[in-house]
Each structure stands twice: as structure tokens, then as C-alpha cells.
């Protein structure tokens, strides 16, 4: 028994385009909402949670629908094609609405422009505002108008050009207040933006479960951790490509905080469509799924009657399996509570607290994950999925705990090291958690159980942007990493109670043992 890496890579192009989209979405939408619409962290968190609210019912629904779908292209492929096409078109349309809002801010949007700074000061001089750290201030009590209009986004320090803390602490919040005033005066643009955002999110939700369920459809159960490592490797490749693109477009630069995203989103859409074309030209879903079922019978992994019942539905779980599934899903909720809080807020945190390029830091995390995926899949096949996940949770908690003590003066290398550790940890968790869920079901229920997995993760992602945003508004942005560390610690505890879903020792399969001897 040996994993067909070529086929798995081709299947992974669906996840590649999904991760490309979400990397761009998570990094840019919070910046648009806060910088151009002037939303608080809490309200931007509400908007960022919309996709997760939709996912709570749409992912299980479309996972189950795809289980029952019988089409010429297979069960999953039609959903992937339709969802991707709509999402790519609507993403570009979203940038046009973003540009419309930018026009409402034309008198205050120019960076380092004295006239724009004068307008900001005149409008917000006597308002009580908040720094990114949560400290209240009144602009007129901190600066005269002449002092304020001399503030620049960057200053020279020790021979280096660095972000000016006065700019991020005082100019940015004041300009965001102006943006909120413009939004309140003309709310139609925000309404239209949210409507288009909903269309994009619905189209992505339509095919996420079918896309992820395709891997178990065409992969034997003992090989799914290795296959999921390849799938996640493809996803990370999509994410790191978008992060590199962000560096090219300088999306995290202070001078580009009010940039137009049309060109950037157009390239993202092109990447998604290119991946879809490769997927369509290479993946033979129905043929590969049938071959997998025949191999499962030949190797004794499933009885012939089980394989024949794949299309009809699944089996009922035992009481112990139900308990394990509940604790596993609870663990998924908890570690996503911690992890997604960081990913959804880090672009804002890095810009305002660390004064660092979030693209570079996240690229390091993705690169570390990419290097780890295949070794982690191999380790899990030997040590077991549960033990491997527990090790990953410990690493993730360590990374978040150390990161909580870092600030703008901390060595950049140290923050990069912590994000590298977090990338390795997340790879360790991600490679094994999804296979543990689908290990408990039959092939006829893979889409439904994929929906369970994503319902758990999305339930956390509904609440955590709002909760972390509220805490950041109340106590300052420094609360982000301690918040994340608490939830990953709780995930370690609940994971200890999971007793089912682990990979079975491969040595039990004679053909596989022979294959390993040949290797």
C-alpha cells in the first residue's frame, strides 16, 4: 500500500485555491473595515465572523448534499467549479466597492499630506479616541495643529527608516474616526460591500466541504494522514504565494493603508482560476474513487459489502465513538478559538503593536508548516495521530505564550522564530485532526463528517474574532496572544479524552509491510 502522491497533489489544487482566497481575505478585509470604513476591532470582528456563521450550517449541508450527488463529473467536482467561478468574479467586484468608499475619504486619505492631516485634526481635535493599545486620548491635548500636521508615517532611527509610533498611535485612530464619520454619513457603500462579501462567502462555503471530502474519497484510510499532509502542503503553498504577492503589493506598509485593492484582488482571482483549470484537467474523481474502493476490498481494509454500501450511506457510531467524536470536535473548537484569533487580527496587531511587516512573519510560519507537513504525516503513521496532535498543541501554546511578551523593541528574529514554531505546530495539528474525524465514518458519510469538522472549526471562528475584538478594544491589543494561549491549553485537556479515530498500525497490513521493506 503506497500513497499516490501525484494524484493527491492534483486533488490538492482545490485546497490550494481555497487557501489562496482565505489568506488574502484574512489579511486585507480587516484592514479595509478598520482603515476605510472606520470600524472598531469589535465590529470588524463581527463582519469577519460572517463567513463562519454561514459555514455553521452551509458546510454540513453541502457536504451532505455532495455525498448524495451523482453527476458525470463525480460527487464533489461540480460544487468546486461553480463555487470558485462565482467567488473569483465577486472578489474583483468587491474591490470596486472598496474604491467607492475610498473616494468618500479623498480629503483625508493622502498619506503624509499636510492638508489631509489638517482636515483630520480639525474634525477630531476634541474627540476622545483610543490608541491601538487601548489608551484614551484627546488629540488637542496631545498636539497643537502645527505639531500634528508635521507627523510623518516614517522616521529615521539609528540610520534606519522605521514606522513612526506617533503616526500609528494618533494619526491612524484619528483618520479611522474620520472614516467612520464618512461611513455613517453614507452607509449605502458599507451595505453594498457587505452584500457582495456575503455572496463571496456563500460561494466559498458551497464547495469547501466537497473539496476537502474529495481526499478521503480517493485515499485508503491508513494513508489519509499522509495524504492530508500533501493537501495541507498544497494549501500552504497557496497561502505563501498570496503572502509573497502581499509583499509585492506592499499591502502591510503604512503608506498603503488606504490603497486600492483592485489589482491585488484581480491577481488573487487569477490564481484561483488557474488552480481550478489544473484541477479540472487532471482529476478524474469517479474513476479514482472506484479504484480506491476496489483496493480497500483487496487489502482487507473493508469488506466488499461495505464498499458496495458506500453510495447508500454510513454506519451508526458506538457510544464510545460518539464520546470520542464529541471530545475531538470540542478540541477543534478550542484550538481554533486560539489560532483564528491570531490569524484574523495579526495584520492589525503587527501594524500597530509590533510595527513589522505581517506578510514576512506569516510567510515564515507558512514556510515552516510546508517543511513540516510530510514529516508530520509520516510520524503520525508511526506514533499515532492523537500523540502527534498533543505535541502540536504544546508547541502552539508555547509559541503564543512567548509571543505575548514581544513588542516593537523585541528582536524581529524572535517573533519570526515563534511564528515558525506556530507554523510547525499548526501543521502537526491540521494534518491529523481531519483524518481522525473521517476515520470514524464510512465512505458514504465522508461529506457529512467533513461538515462536522468544519462546523466545529467555524463555530469557534464565529465567536473568536468578536470576543478577541471586544477584549482588544477594552484592554488593548496586547491581550491577543494570552487569549490564544489560554484556549490552546484547554484544547490539550479535552484532546486527552479522545479514544477513537487514531490511525491503525500499518504493520497489520501485510502488503504495506512488504512495501515498506522495498522502500
Where does each model-flagged region fall?
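C-terminal transmembrane helical hairpin of 12-TM major facilitator-type secondary transporters
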Residues: 387-430
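Cytoplasmic membrane-interface "Motif A"-like loop-to-helix N-cap segments
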Residues: 68-84, 382-394
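Loop-to-transmembrane helix entry/capping segments in MFS-fold secondary transporters
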Residues: 41-42, 221-231, 441-453
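Intracellular loop-helix junctions on the cytosolic face of multi-pass helical membrane proteins
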Residues: 1-3, 104, 109-196, 202-207, ...
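Helix-loop boundary and gating motifs at the non-cytosolic
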Residues: 1-52, 130, 134-137, 148, ...
Amino acid at each position: 500500500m503506497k500513497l499516490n502522491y501525484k494524484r493527491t497533489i492534483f486533488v490538492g489544487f482545490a485546497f490550494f485555491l481555497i487557501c489562496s482566497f482565505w489568506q488574502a481575505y484574512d489579511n486585507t478585509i480587516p484592514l479595509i473595515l478598520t482603515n476605510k470604513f472606520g470600524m472598531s476591532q469589535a465590529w470588524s470582528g463581527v463582519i469577519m465572523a460572517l463567513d463562519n456563521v454561514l459555514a455553521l450550517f452551509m458546510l454540513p449541508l453541502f457536504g451532505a448534499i455532495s455525498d448524495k450527488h451523482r453527476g458525470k463529473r463525480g460527487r464533489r467536482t461540480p460544487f468546486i467549479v461553480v463555487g470558485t467561478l462565482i467567488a473569483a468574479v465577486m472578489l474583483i467586484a468587491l474591490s470596486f466597492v472598496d474604491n467607492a468608499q475610498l473616494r468618500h475619504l479623498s480629503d483625508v486619505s493622502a498619506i503624509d499630506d499636510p492638508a489631509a492631516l489638517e482636515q483630520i485634526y480639525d474634525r477630531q481635535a476634541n474627540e476622545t479616541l483610543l490608541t491601538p493599545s487601548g489608551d484614551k486620548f484627546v488629540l488637542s491635548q496631545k498636539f497643537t495643529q502645527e505639531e500634528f500636521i508635521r507627523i510623518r508615517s516614517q522616521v529615521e532611527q539609528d540610520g534606519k527608516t522605521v514606522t513612526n509610533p506617533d503616526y500609528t498611535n494618533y494619526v491612524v485612530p484619528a483618520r479611522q474616526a474620520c472614516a467612520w464619520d464618512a461611513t455613517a454619513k453614507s452607509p449605502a457603500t458599507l451595505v453594498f460591500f457587505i452584500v457582495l462579501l456575503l455572496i463571496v462567502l456563500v460561494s466559498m462555503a458551497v464547495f469547501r466541504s466537497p473539496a476537502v471530502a474529495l481526499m478521503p474519497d480517493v485515499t485508503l484510510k491508513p494513508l489519509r494522514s499522509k495524504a492530508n499532509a500533501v493537501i495541507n502542503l498544497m494549501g500552504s503553498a497557496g497561502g505563501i504565494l498570496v503572502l509573497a504577492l502581499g509583499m509585492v503589493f506592499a499591502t502591510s506598509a503604512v503608506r498603503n493603508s488606504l490603497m486600492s485593492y483592485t489589482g491585488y484582488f484581480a491577481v488573487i482571482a487569477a490564481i484561483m482560476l488557474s488552480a481550478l483549470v489544473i484541477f479540472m484537467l487532471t482529476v478524474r474523481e469517479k474513476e479514482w474513487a472506484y479504484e480506491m474502493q476496489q483496493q480497500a476490498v483487496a487489502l482487507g481494509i473493508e469488506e466488499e459489502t461495505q464498499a458496495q454500501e458506500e453510495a447508500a450511506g454510513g454506519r451508526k457510531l458506538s457510544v464510545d465513538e460518539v464520546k470520542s467524536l464529541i471530545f475531538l470536535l470540542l478540541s477543534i473548537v478550542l484550538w481554533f478559538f486560539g489560532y483564528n484569533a491570531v490569524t484574523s487580527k495579526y495584520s492589525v496587531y503587527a501594524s500597530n503593536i509590533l510595527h513589522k511587516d505581517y506578510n514576512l512573519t506569516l510567510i515564515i510560519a507558512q514556510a515552516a508548516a510546508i517543511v513540516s507537513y510530510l514529516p508530520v504525516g509520516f510520524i503520525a503513521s508511526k506514533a499515532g495521530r492523537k500523540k502527534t496532535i498533543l505535541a502540536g498543541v504544546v508547541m502552539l501554546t508555547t509559541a503564543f505564550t512567548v509571543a505575548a511578551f514581544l513588542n516593537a523593541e523585541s528582536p524581529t528574529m524572535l517573533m519570526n522564530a515563534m511564528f515558525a514554531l506556530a507554523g510547525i505546530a499548526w501543521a502537526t495539528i491540521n494534518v491529523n485532526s481531519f483524518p481522525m474525524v473521517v476515520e470514524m465514518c464510512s465512505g458514504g458519510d465522508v461529506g457529512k463528517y467533513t461538515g462536522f469538522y468544519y462546523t466545529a472549526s467555524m463555530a469557534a471562528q464565529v465567536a473568536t474574532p468578536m470576543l478577541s475584538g471586544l477584549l482588544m478594544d477594552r484592554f488593548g491589543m496586547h491581550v491577543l496572544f494570552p487569549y490564544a494561549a489560554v484556549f490552546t491549553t484547554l484544547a490539550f485537556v479535552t484532546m486527552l479524552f479522545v479514544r477513537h479515530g487514531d490511525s491503525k498500525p500499518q504493520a497489520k497490513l501485510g502488503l504495506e509491510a512488504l512495501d515498506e521493506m522495498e522502500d
